From Swiss-Prot:
Function: GTPase-activating protein for ADP ribosylation factor family members, including ARF1. Multidomain scaffold protein that interacts with numerous proteins and therefore participates in many cellular functions, including receptor internalization, focal adhesion remodeling, and signaling by both G protein-coupled receptors and tyrosine kinase receptors. Through PAK1 activation, positively regulates microtubule nucleation during interphase. Plays a role in the regulation of cytokinesis; for this function, may act in a pathway also involving ENTR1 and PTPN13.
Coiled-coil segments on the chain, per record: 440-474
Region spans: Interaction with MAPK1: 411-466
Residue numbers bearing the Phosphotyrosine modification: Y224, Y383, Y545, Y554
Start and end residues, zinc fingers (C4-type): 11-34
Biased composition (Acidic residues): 385-394
PANTHER family: ARF GTPASE-ACTIVATING PROTEIN GIT1, G PROTEIN-COUPLED RECEPTOR KINASE INTERACTING ARFGAP
Gene Ontology CC terms, in alphabetical order: calyx of Held; centrosome; cytosol; dendrite; endosome; excitatory synapse; focal adhesion; GABA-ergic synapse
Name of the protein described by the UniProt record: ARF GTPase-activating protein GIT1
Region (Interaction with PXN and TGFB1I1): 637-761
Region of interest (Interaction with NCK2 and GRIN3A), ranges: 366-587
Length: 761
């Protein structure tokens, strides 16, 4: 289906006349030269289709023309309309400019970097901003203003946003209001037509109840867009979604199956739902690339544009995906037509089996479904050997010269609605499942709330136990601060002397011989036996013991000062290692005045370890509470799956890379939101592991991971000075931030290594 605009259009990127391509996700029309750059960016940046030679749903084409005619291009070129930008030398590309590097650099800056999009004045909290934008989108889709919704989506609004008060998504609102074009735009940006509302009703149900039957049918097509597109690529047909949702072609010579093909099919069936969905989406993107390649070669007519630089030989890299997945996506281009068709048939069959809930069948039951090994396949071109004599009027688009009609007749379509389950029963079951899932989510939220309340009560109990034990102790003499003459005894006798007074303690801070251990610490823990709990008025909400050092009391070498260092018994400062006990015991035995023995500490005897110094620095900002609980009780030997740990590690690494880019670009105002994202990713990764892991390497790695994440937050908050105009040493701060990020990455790598090793054993 094709349609031209009512007026002469120009390319949105270089103003060339009569553009032949459309960017669906950007709502603009582009010429052939600019389209070659769009295709090289990938579908995650720009989804392109030819206006005349590609198959278009009528409402989708109408949506693109509406956006293009209403000035959607001004969204992506907002700052270029400012006269100040013209004076600075930044300009739009011209039709006479070369594709590389002028047009390509401009298009990348425009769509990939979003260099010309209007920026919001305040982006301190991206989460709150995205939520507000999504709520605006939720309200705007009931109207017919497409440009406003596209602008909100470009600023970060979520198409699948679930409104907490109204219990619906934007697609529910658009379907109820009958806004077909708004629904098309939302689906392009990832809205799910099958997502239930708070009552389990989908946007399709909303459209039908409101009497918008054509919109409901279109939403059903969007729900099965992936399988419909794969089937249409093979045989040129789509299911009508009334008698069935799947058309599964089969190879005419599929009875000749090898053992390798049967084994490959079993591997496909053994994939988890998430991995199978990722594979299906990657094959969908490869189908789109091959169809656009066919259109490109057919329309260029071997002109100068058909060059290596304008071709897209494989799927471009998507930075949101892992390196392994990107490599697998690119290897799909190496499949010849026969291999690729066999893979598509297997995916269609497996998708149908999974959605209908059928059990796995033996390979002999479905001889037409297989995955071919590349070494066992011949070099036949497409499906010429099984082409039919029937002719169609479709125009040739394949580079091999074979027509889509021949390919359609070379396949036998399977039944559209086999199986004992009727469509009505399936829809009822799906609705009941959606309702059950909504109830499960609600119960999970209630459970989480109760768990938080239980943890709070446990902290209160520990606090009361500590106060009770303190009140039961016999009263002792209250130590008084020493006189200045007495404090003088703590200073060295000579400035250059190397003799240190090691037999004195800090005044009124530590009570020697105290054996109070409410947490059941190890008997040999020297530091715990030297701590006395403060009065209840000095206790923090989440900490029972703290080493309270008055400001300026100790001056540690290299300018590190300790003001308040709260910790729990599970923190690294309370470990039973001799090194940590020796270093910490020195802290309790030294200095009582402004001039303490720390100023003369020998270089060969470090006062605190590196980890201890980091905890002291962290204590200057806020209390630190490690995520690991006390190790009282049974230890849990269980470990999460290696796949889950690697997935969370990639998320942590991605957020760290974003932070490092901000540091390289001197965007210090981005430190705080980046650190929040890293902390969230670290929390999700730590939640994979048991509360009391049995392996000591796992416990130490988790402590380092959580401690570094908290310290990173503390360091990043220093970018905002406590008083306006106060100087901030950004160079030193950046070094501290990079060090924290390194510690987080190191701990995450250790957890991946440990998990992989333990799973192999």
């Amino acid at each position: 289906m094709s349609r031209k605009g009512p007026r002469a259009e120009v390319c949105a990127d270089c103003s060339a006349p009569d553009p032949g391509w459309a960017s669906i996700s950007r709502g603009v029309l582009v010429c052939d030269e600019c389209c070659s750059v769009h295709r090289s960016l990938g579908r995650h940046i720009s989804i392109v289709k030819h206006l005349r030679h590609s198959a278009w749903p009528p409402t989708l084409l109408q949506m693109v023309h509406t956006l293009a005619s209403n000035g959607a291009n001004s969204i992506w070129e907002h700052s270029l309309l400012d006269p100040a930008q013209v004076q600075s030398g930044r300009r739009k590309a011209n039709p006479q400019d070369k594709v590389h590097p002028i047009k390509s650099e401009f298009i990348r800056a425009k769509y990939q970097m979003l260099a010309f999009v209007h920026k919001l004045p305040c982006r301190d909290d991206d989460g709150v901003t995205a939520k507000d934008l999504s709520k605006q989108l939720h309200s705007s889709v009931r109207t017919g203003n497409l440009e406003t919704c596209l602008r909100l989506l470009s600023l970060g609004a979520q198409a699948n946003f679930f409104h907490p008060e109204k219990g619906t998504t934007p697609l529910h609102v658009a379907a109820k209001a009958g806004q077909t074009l708004q629904a098309e735009l939302l689906v392009v940006y990832g809205a799910d037509p099958g997502s239930p509302d708070v009552n389990g009703r989908t946007p399709i149900d909303y459209a039908r109840q409101a009497g918008h039957h054509e919109l409901a049918e279109r939403l059903v097509e969007c729900q099965y867009e992936l399988t419909d597109r794969l089937a249409f690529y093979l045989c040129g047909r789509k299911p009508d979604h009334k008698n069935g949702h799947y058309i599964i072609p089969q190879m005419a010579d599929s009875l000749d199956l090898s053992e390798l093909a049967k084994a490959a099919k079993k591997k496909l069936q053994a994939l988890s739902n998430r991995l199978f969905e990722e594979l299906a989406m990657d094959v969908y993107d490869e189908v789109d690339r091959r169809e656009n390649d066919a259109v490109w070669l057919a329309t260029q007519n071997h002109s100068t544009l058909v060059t290596e630089r304008s071709a897209v030989p494989f799927l471009p890299v998507n930075p949101e995906y892992s390196a392994t997945r990107n490599q697998g996506r690119q290897k799909l281009a190496r499949f010849n037509a026969r291999e690729f068709a066999t893979l598509i048939i297997d995916i269609l069959s497996e998708a149908k089996r999974r959605q209908q809930g059928k059990s796995l069948s033996s390979p002999t039951d479905n001889l037409e479904l297989s995955l071919r090994s590349q070494s066992d396949l011949d070099d036949q071109h497409d499906y010429d050997s099984v082409a039919s004599d029937e002719d169609t009027d479709q125009e040739p688009l394949r580079s091999t010269g074979a027509t889509r009609s021949n390919r359609a007749r070379s396949m036998d379509s399977s039944d559209l609605s086999d199986g004992a389950v009727t469509l009505q029963e399936y829809l009822e079951l799906k609705k009941a499942l959606a309702t059950s899932e909504a109830k499960v989510q609600q119960l999970m939220k209630v459970n989480s709330s109760l768990s938080d309340e239980l943890r709070r009560l446990q902290r209160e109990i520990h606090k009361l136990q500590a106060e009770n034990l303190q009140l039961r102790q016999p009263p002792g003499p209250v130590p008084t601060p020493p006189l200045p003459s007495e404090r003088a005894e703590h200073t060295p006798m000579a400035p250059g002397g190397s003799t240190h007074r090691r037999d004195r303690q800090a005044f009124s801070m530590y009570e020697p011989g105290s054996a109070l251990k409410p947490f059941g610490g190890p008997p040999g823990d020297e530091l715990t036996t030297r701590l006395q709990p403060f009065h209840s008025t000095e206790l923090e909400d989440d900490a029972i013991y703290s080493v309270h050092v008055p400001a300026g009391l100790y001056r540690i070498r290299k300018g590190v000062s300790a003001s308040a260092v709260p910790f729990t018994p599970s923190s690294p400062l309370l470990s039973c290692s001799q090194e940590g006990s020796r270093h910490t015991s020195k802290l309790s035995r030294h200095g009582s005045g402004a001039d303490s023995d720390y100023e003369n500490t020998q270089s060969g005897d470090p006062l605190l370890g590196l980890e201890g110094k980091r905890f002291l620095e962290l204590g200057k900002e806020e209390d630190f509470h490690p995520e690991l609980e006390s190790l009282d009780g049974d230890l849990d030997p269980g470990l999460p799956s290696t796949e889950d740990v690697i997935l969370k590690t990639e998320q942590v690494t991605k957020n760290i890379q974003e932070l490092l880019r901000a540091a390289q670009e001197f965007k210090h105002d981005s430190f705080v939101p980046c650190s929040e994202k890293i902390h969230l990713a670290v929390t999700e990764m730590a939640s994979l592991f048991p509360k009391r892991p049995a392996l000591e390497p796992v416990r130490s790695s988790l402590r380092l991971l959580n401690a570094s994440a908290y310290r990173l937050q503390s360091e990043c908050r220093k970018t905002v000075p406590p008083e306006p105009g106060a100087p901030v040493d950004f160079q030193l701060l950046t070094q501290q931030v990079i060090q924290c990020a390194y510690d987080i990455a190191k701990a995450a790598k250790q957890l991946v290594t440990i998990t992989t090793r333990e799973k192999k054993q």
